[in-house]
UniProtKB/Swiss-Prot annotation:
Keyword set includes Translocase: no
Main location: cytoplasm
Gene: GRXS2
Pfam families hit by this protein: Glutaredoxin
Function according to Swiss-Prot or TrEMBL: May only reduce GSH-thiol disulfides, but not protein disulfides.
Positions contributing to [2Fe-2S] cluster binding: 21
Entry-linked SUPFAM superfamilies: Thioredoxin-like (SSF52833)
Coiled-coil residue spans: none
Molecular function in Gene Ontology: 2 iron, 2 sulfur cluster binding; metal ion binding
Gene Ontology cellular component terms for the protein in this record: cytoplasm
UniProt cross-references to InterPro entries, sorted A to Z: GlrX-like_pln_2 (IPR011905), Glutaredoxin (IPR002109), Glutaredoxin_subgr (IPR014025), Thioredoxin-like_sf (IPR036249)
Name of the protein in question: Monothiol glutaredoxin-S2
Amino acid sequence: MDMITKMVMERPVVIYSKSSCCMSHTIKTLLCDFGANPAVYELDEISRGREIEQALLRLGCSPAVPGVFIGGELVGGANEVMSLHLNGSLIPMLKRAGALWV
């Protein structure tokens, strides 16, 4: 989990994903379309991906992908991100984290 903590503090928005996951693709597209430029870690393509996936599950991100962190805090998965978007909270959250300069 220390590895995740270090990784999510390096960028305003971090997405843990799998290259074959359609929900991960949807969330990456949404955040990129806003201009957030997230750091994306494809767990099926990096050496410690399995270990990170297990740590995400222990943190409460279920399913583990997509796992979205904004401002160093776990937001959750696709359902949580889409709920924030629909209720108008996502863009202000991205601005507070320094991911958007609008």
